[in-house]
Amino acid sequence: MRGAWFLVVAIGVAAVGRPASAAEAPRPARLLVVSVTTGFRHASIGTAEPVLEELGRSTGLFHCDHLRMPPGRLPQPKPPKRAKDTSAEEWAKQEAEFKRAQEQFRRDDQAWQAGLKAEFAKVFSAESLRDFDGVIFLSTTGDLPVPDLAAFLDWIKSGKAFIGFHAATDTFKSSDAYCDMIGGHFAGHPWGAGGEHAFVVHEPGHRVAAMFPERFRWKDEIYQYDLRTKPENLRVLVSLDMQASQPKEPWHVPVAWVRDYGKGRVFSTNFGHNDTTWKEPMFQKHMAEGIAWALGRFDAPAAPNPEVQAAEYLRSVVAAAAAATKADADALRAKADAKIAKDAAWATGLRPMLLGIRGLKPEDRAAAYAEVIAEVEKP
């Protein structure tokens, strides 16, 4: 497998500051780092790969075997843009040429796709996976040619680590089983890469999130997730702080979480779109602790926290409702927090009503917002 044409191995070395005796330190874990994309490709992947390698070396925690995009793929033809002075006859010629170029690309791309499929069949075989302690999906997108997705998920359940960075949640969209494992699936990113967004840490003492201030701002692209997310499966550690962010949407946006998956462990973080994120020491510490936890190097709480998520969901709806109705956001938030503190199950009980708002267009939410505000203001 090491001679494969696009599986590249980067061996980690002992960390600075480790005990002098090698016998006292666990061996570095072997992680398969997958950065293949069949959908959108993030430019930050090229920044992230050497950062991960150096993180493995400096901590002595792991070394990386990279499964990368194979070389030699021809660029896809770009559709023509019609100029104002283009005649109908000339435009028809341009469209016809584009269609011919598309057909030629599809024919030429078959060999590349076959090579990609063959490499995945080799690397994701049961024999190959036995050599790894876990896998990192590094901003993967689309349907990867994993030969047996169910077998791969069972491999994680057997006691392996799965670490997902950023667009790992934009992978295998049609697979409910994969979505269940990773915790959610991409459903847009209203909070763009150029904006500085606000975040809240739900457990400041949790090692995977302890490096962040309890409330902080960060410049990165933030995903929202579709309705397949199951709060009863996840322990969310970091969420978008909707009241301090723009736009204000009436739903919870988890950002980093952990979960047990059979005997395996899953760590997923949405951070990682921007190059600058990967260079930040705080994010690198977040990565290192998340990877170490997923590998079982230390124990930390992973039991689901649906009540915490329900409370944050309600706060997000309150923030959106206050903005839409010009109500006093701070006063509403204070009342909601007081009720949550008195009865944590109260917000959970409102979840069905809150979920219904997500299916409404912004212009149709007024009645639903009024109902939520009335619930918050009840004595």
Residue ranges of predicted features:
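Bacterial N-terminal signal peptides
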Residues: 4-15
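Sec/Tat signal peptide C-region and signal peptidase I cleavage site
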Residues: 18-22
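Extracellular ligand-binding/catalytic regions of CAZymes and related secreted enzymes
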Residues: 23-29, 35, 43-46, 50-59, ...
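Structural recognition of the beta-strand scaffold that forms the well-ordered cores
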Residues: 30-34, 64-66, 133-139, 156, ...
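Solvent-exposed loop/turn segments at secondary-structure junctions
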Residues: 37-40, 70-73, 140-144, 162, ...
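Glycine-rich, highly charged phosphate/nucleotide-binding loops
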Residues: 93-127
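Catalytic beta-strand/loop cores that center a nucleophilic Ser/Cys/Thr
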Residues: 99, 119-120, 131, 184, ...
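A glycine-rich, often tryptophan-bearing local segment used as a flexible ligand/cofactor-contacting loop or short
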Residues: 128, 137, 141-211
